[in-house]
UniProtKB/Swiss-Prot annotation:
Location(s), subcellular: Cytoplasm
Catalytic activity, as annotated: RNA(n+1) + phosphate = RNA(n) + a ribonucleoside 5'-diphosphate
Leader peptide range in chain numbering: none
Cofactor(s) required for function per UniProt: Mg(2+)
Residue stretches making up the S1 motif domain: 624-692
PROSITE patterns: KH_TYPE_1, S1
Any one GO cellular component localisation term in the record: cytosol
One matching Pfam family: RNase_PH
Organism, scientific name: Lachnoclostridium phytofermentans (strain ATCC 700394 / DSM 18823 / ISDg)
Name listed for the protein in its UniProt record: Polyribonucleotide nucleotidyltransferase
Lineage: Bacteria, Bacillati, Bacillota, Clostridia, Lachnospirales
């Protein structure tokens, strides 16, 4: 038995088939939004996973290229590892769902989203988010939902909900908001310097749209929802906590965590754990495996009380005080640009590399409108940054997510391709970490880009606000610039990046069941204040304006415009002409469909030579024009010259010398470079050239 439910969502039909496919999953929703089709399933293990102190949730978003009628490239001709977009979408699905599961639930849960058909006007990412929420809501998996998600654009100053592809292309905002019935639970945004008040308007408008979807989900659950199953709670026994407090008093725990040096705090906690292990080894050996989790919760309770009740932060700062800041540029002498930003014990060194546009990242995903991206930001988080030993396995989901967030924050201030015809890569290396490395990456990337001579429009800074809540909605405290401990034990990580004039990126993670309007408004306000302080007091003194030229080790680019109809002449058959220019000059050449030609190299003379070759190729021969050519062939009647690869002409023997000659070889040999003047067309309509009529004044 199955049933289809439908509603109108932003002028398009959203329909959900329940009971039609994937019947063995705990919950399955076959989603249709326009012509976009996504199968969302939720499954849970029968038993809890032993020996863990976290909820084992896994979210997958699978892009199948058949969804857009494409065959995967490569040798195997099948989908391989998840794309960057798939990883980012999995993370954005995870964020609103995770807080709504029970904190002490230890059964493995997997949310899988299979994209099977894509309508460019109906977002598969949004469809998957709604599908995951529905599949869990109708399943027997414990879940405190429902929740719903809306995307918001800003076109000509007006908010647009769940925008089409055409609207997204001109939108100043790409906002995703997830909500429960009464609170906002997730915010993700990229924006073109959208003012704070407009951003708040968009967030709360999306929250209202979400209520319509939640009512729709309620109808599905009422008819097809399963009874939620029971589970074994993994809470620490109360008698163990009582025993711990006899060994380590609350005052001693507070003293252990109250320091501005992370390593000192960690050493204090290690000593507490060792002390408890000695005591319990004799009295309660069955508790030994619970010590780590118990001490974690003891720390958490202590830190939260210090902040909420005593207004005292673990490192001694005021509630809205930012950690010690430092900024500098040009630490690495041979790179194209470098910048380092330090915030307390968080330190990021970012390196900028410039390259021709042909080095832009090629994209082969479901979004057929996006073929490549010119700006790339990569974030690395090595184990030494937190004093650990761990082999490097390449970037994980967290690294990809942090890199994308900083990338999104900086895109609005980058120059256009016409203004700055380079592909740009920034790499943020985490030197040291104690919270908010992604926002430090935004600051360091801004410094590095300016040092590299990238003419960004404005400086961008990022900051994160935290939250500690009490028993009521009115009992809370928003913290500015959270460190790692406040992130771990707090309720929110609200990251905001932007310029003086507006927001460029937001990412909000929470561990509670949502945020009230008052909390969101305060977080937005606090991040703006902190952002302006960082730009004015720290970043501007380090480098106030982008360098007027790229660095001496960066490639130079000269750009000219040619008639688009002449592109084929420059490229030549199978690339023969353009490859010959590249071989002779050592430059790189890019040509777009509009006829913009970019010549990239480090030797100015060779770049000028390549430009002259291209201009010669696209120039129509006219009487009186002077050209320089190389003798490539000699015949009895004259010599053939190559003016540029693929561009040749002939000089008749009578036009070679002012003196009469019997043989061309008397004056010219193969390889000679000579200057000629164009005589126009002869009686046969052929272009003729003359060496003897060339004069220096030509």
């Amino acid at each position: 038995m199955y049933k289809s439910f439908s509603m109108e969502l932003a002028g398009r039909t959203l329909s959900v088939d329940v009971g039609r496919v994937a019947a063995q999953a705990n919950g399955a929703a076959f989603m249709h939004y326009g012509d976009t089709v996504v199968l969302s399933t939720a499954t849970a293990s029968d038993k809890p996973r032993e020996g863990i102190d976290f909820f084992p949730l896994s979210v997958e978003y699978e892009e199948k290229l058949y969804a857009v009628g494409k065959v995967p490239g490569g040798f195997n001709k099948r989908e391989g590892k998840a794309s960057e977009n798939a990883i980012l979408t999995s993370r954005v699905i995870d964020r609103p769902m995770r807080p709504l599961f029970p904190k002490d639930y230890r059964n493995d849960v997997t949310l899988n989203n299979l994209v099977m058909s894509v309508d460019p006007d109906c977002s598969p990412e949004l469809t998957a988010m709604l599908g995951s929420a529905i599949s869990v809501a109708i399943s027997d998996i414990p879940f405190d939902g429902p929740c719903a998600t809306t995307q918001v654009g800003l076109v000509d100053g007006e908010l647009v909900f769940n925008p089409t592809a055409a609207q997204k292309a001109v939108s100043d905002l790409a906002l995703t908001v997830a909500s429960t019935r009464d609170k906002v639970i997730m915010i993700e945004a990229g924006a073109n310097e959208v003012p704070e008040d407009k951003m708040l308007e968009a967030i709360f408008a999306a929250h209202e749209v979400n209520q319509e979807v939640i009512q729709f989900i309620d109808k599905i659950v009422a008819e097809f929802g399963k009874e939620k199953h029971g589970y074994i709670s993994c809470e620490i026994p109360e008698e163990m906590f009582a025993a711990i407090k006899e060994v380590v008093t609350p005052e001693q725990m507070e003293e252990a965590v109250f320091t501005d040096v992370k390593q000192v705090r960690e050493e204090n906690i290690r000593e507490i754990k060792n002390k408890l292990a000695e005591v319990f080894e004799e009295s309660n050996p069955e508790w030994l495996h619970l010590i780590d989790e118990a001490v974690y919760k003891y720390q958490k309770k202590t830190v939260r009380k210090m902040i909420l009740k005593d207004h005292k932060r673990p490192d001694g700062r005021e509630i809205h005080q930012i950690r010690r800041l430092a900024a500098e540029v040009d630490m690495l002498p041979r790179v194209h640009g470098s910048g380092m930003f330090t915030r307390g014990q968080t330190q990021i060194l970012t390196v900028t590399t410039l390259a021709p546009l042909s080095e832009a990242q090629k994209l082969d995903g479901l979004d057929e409108a996006e073929k490549s991206k010119r700006y790339m930001h990569h974030y690395n988080f090595p184990s030494y940054s937190v004093g650990e030993t761990k082999p490097s396995r390449g970037p994980g989901r967290r690294e990809i997510g942090h890199g994308a967030l900083a990338e999104r924050a900086l895109i609005p201030v980058l120059p256009s391709e016409a203004e700055f015809p380079y592909a740009i890569r920034t790499v943020s290396e985490t030197m040291e970490s104690n919270g908010s490395t992604s926002q430090a990456s935004v600051c360091a990337s801004t410094l590095s880009l300016m040092a590299a001579g990238v003419p960004i429009k404005k400086q961008v800074a990022g900051i994160s606000c935290g939250l500690v809540t009490g028993d009521t909605d009115d009992d809370y405290l928003v913290l500015t610039d959270i460190q790692g401990l406040e992130d771990f034990f707090g309720d929110m990580d609200f990251k905001v990046a932007g310029t003086h004039d507006g927001i460029t990126a937001i990412q909000m993670d929470i561990k509670i069941h949502g945020l009230t309007r008052a909390i969101i408004e305060e977080a937005i306000r606090r991040t703006k204040e902190a952002r302006e302080y960082i730009i004015n007091e720290v970043m501007t003194p380090a480098i106030a304006e982008p360098r007027t030229e790229v660095g001496k080790y960066a490639p130079k680019i000269i750009q000219i415009q040619i008639d688009p109809q002449k592109i084929g002449d420059v490229v030549g058959q199978r690339g023969k002409t353009i490859n010959a220019i590249i071989e002779q000059t050592g430059v790189k050449i890019d040509i777009n469909d509009e006829g913009a030609v970019s010549v990239c190299g480090t030797d100015k003379d060779m770049m000028d030579k390549a430009i002259n070759m291209i201009r010669t190729i696209v120039t129509e021969f006219e009487e009186g024009q002077v050209f320089e050519g190389k003798v490539i062939s000699i015949k009895e009647f004259g010599a053939f010259l190559e003016f540029a690869p693929g561009k040749e002409g002939m000089v008749h023997i009578s036009k070679i010398s002012k003196e009469r000659i019997n043989h061309v070889e008397d004056v010219l040999t193969l390889g000679d470079v000579v200057k000629v003047v164009c005589l126009g067309k002869d009686k046969m309509g052929r272009i003729s050239f003359s060496i003897k009529d060339y004069k220096e004044e030509n």
